[in-house]
Amino acid sequence: MSERESWHKEIDLFLVAMGYFTRIPMPKWVEVDSDKLNKASRYFGLVGLLIGLLSAIVFWLTQNWLPAGVSVLLAMLVGVLLTGGFHEDGLADTFDGFGGGWTAEDKLRIMKDSRLGSYGAIALILALLLKWQLLVELALYDPVVAGSALIVAHTVSRVVAASIIFTEKYVRDDETSKSKPLSQHQGINELFILVASGVLVLLFLKGLAALSLLLVMIGLRRLIVVIFRRQIGGYTGDTLGAAQQICEIVCYLVLLIVGSIL
């Protein structure tokens, strides 16, 4: 394979990843199959970086003319519009299932129900409020830090969530599932590039903040995996969305705590 063909292949995989995670229209020449989707997992972190960067740009462009709370809300809105609330939906479904079901089968059945239950609604409202409040506090502390936090959190949270695919069992037996192709034939190259994107984005942060966030994310991933195993024996697409949302919130929390003591 020539260098040009190799670059074209990687660009194609990135676009497949972007098409999976966002509502951004893809070029007509981009074709998606299970093999491509598996290999595209290496770029899930970079898609998060793109979403975070666009959100941060909106925040930076508006924060000089609007109250911090409004600028943060607009930045959050950009993220939701870009993804179609993909991860937020997973968070709500996961909390509905984990909160309302007794057995793993009950939980999986409830999670598949398109209706929003009380557990999911509460989780979704609290998650959005937490993100908004933490980002507002970061914005009041330093607008540059707040924008950087958006970039880092959107990237790192997706890296952590996607890494679960490589070590855990996919438990939903549903051929129409959007996440099932990702559960098959993941390679070490995909994992290496995925993790590297998460580590490199920490360069946006100072040394203590980067180290603190790295250690917390490692511990949080372990905790999330243990909970998923106990609840349903593995993961589904919904639980990956929940993992992303939880990790994003914790990213903001860690950066706020570290920033307050520096």
Curated annotation (Swiss-Prot):
Any single GO BP term: cobalamin biosynthetic process
Reactions it catalyzes: alpha-ribazole + adenosylcob(III)inamide-GDP = adenosylcob(III)alamin + GMP + H(+); alpha-ribazole 5'-phosphate + adenosylcob(III)inamide-GDP = adenosylcob(III)alamin 5'-phosphate + GMP + H(+)
Reported cofactor(s): Mg(2+)
Highest taxon of the lineage: Bacteria
EC category: transferase
Entry's transmembrane regions: 43-63, 66-86, 120-140, 146-166, 191-211, 242-262
GO terms of molecular function: adenosylcobinamide-GDP ribazoletransferase activity; cobalamin 5'-phosphate synthase activity
A cellular-component GO term for this protein: plasma membrane
Enzyme Commission code(s) on record: 2.7.8.26
Subcellular location: Cell inner membrane
InterPro entries in UniProt: CobS
PANTHER family: ADENOSYLCOBINAMIDE-GDP RIBAZOLETRANSFERASE
HAMAP family: CobS
Function (record text): Joins adenosylcobinamide-GDP and alpha-ribazole to generate adenosylcobalamin (Ado-cobalamin). Also synthesizes adenosylcobalamin 5'-phosphate from adenosylcobinamide-GDP and alpha-ribazole 5'-phosphate.
Family: Belongs to the CobS family.
Protein name: Adenosylcobinamide-GDP ribazoletransferase
Organism: Shewanella sp. (strain W3-18-1)
Gene name tied to this protein: cobS
